[in-house]
């Protein structure tokens, strides 16, 4: 009763992914977050599978992020899984996690499309003031070659990455409040 199978397996998968996120970059130079974290759709780093894989990744700078996410999953998810059943709970978990990813993409689109537009406008007008919100150390006499401009634009677009299943966890909290 304390660890229904879906909750137990989700916790195991999340812990294994967290450990892989720590060890693989050091041992094999494989950046799990870069590959499987959710990137902005306008970035070259975006892949559709990231809507699912990002839910199993967590901040590696401290174990606290992982612990509190998994504690919340266990604390509230176990009762929902027992009440709804395995399949309904798992569908709900993925639905809320993917939904949170879609909302994150919409927020990024609002933010990052402005940056992309500013870079494109600079390419045609050479008005450096357009880039001041996005780049530091610019003067009115700064000139950025087009090739470098495109590199900077991609760096900004690909810098946005999300990890963790906070959306799924908030969905579980909502469901818990409803039952």
Residue ranges and their predicted role:
Residues 1-179:
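A detector for small-residue-rich transmembrane helices and their helix-helix packing motifs
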